A protein has these predicted regions:
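A structural signal for short hydrophobic/aromatic patches embedded in well-ordered alpha helices
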Residues: 50, 65-66
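Amphipathic alpha-helical binding modules
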Residues: 75-116
Length: 116
C-alpha cells in the first residue's frame, strides 16, 4: 500500500506537535514549576492558583503531572485520527499499520515509514 505524501506529512506534523510543539507547552510549564509567570491572584486567579500548586509539588510529582498532560494531548490526537478514519476522510480511511492512529503511535515510538 502506498499513501499520499500528504498523509505522511500530516502524521509527522502531529507527532511533532506531540513531542515538541503544542503538546509540550503545558508539559514544559509543569516541569519548570511555573504555569504563567505574569499571573497574579487578581489578574489571572486560575493561572496564579496553578503557579501556587506547581510550586508545592516536588520535581518527581511535577514530572508525573507532565507525563499525564503529555498523554492526554497524545490521546486527543489519537482520537481525532480515529474519527477521521471512521468518517472515511481522505487520506485517513486506513493506515500502513492498521489505522492512522496506529501509524501515529508507531511514529511516536520511532517506527520508520515503509520504503524509507
Amino acid at each position: 500500500m502506498t499513501k499520499p505524501k500528504q498523509y505522511r506529512e500530516i502524521i509527522d506534523a502531529l507527532v511533532n506537535a506531540c513531542v515538541a510543539g503544542q503538546g509540550h507547552i503545558a508539559v514544559n510549564r509543569v516541569r519548570a514549576g511555573v504555569w504563567n509567570a505574569a499571573a497574579t491572584a487578581n489578574s489571572m486567579p486560575q493561572e496564579h492558583a496553578a503557579n501556587v500548586l506547581l510550586k508545592r509539588l516536588s520535581p518527581t510529582e511535577r514530572e508525573t503531572l507532565a507525563y499525564l498532560l503529555a498523554s492526554e494531548f497524545r490521546g486527543g490526537v489519537f482520537e481525532t485520527l480515529q474519527a477521521l478514519e471512521a468518517a472515511r476522510i481522505e487520506p485517513f480511511q486506513d493506515g500502513y499499520e492498521g489505522g492512522p492512529h496506529h501509524d501515529l503511535i508507531g511514529r511516536l515510538g520511532g517506527w520508520q515509514w515503509p520504503g524509507n
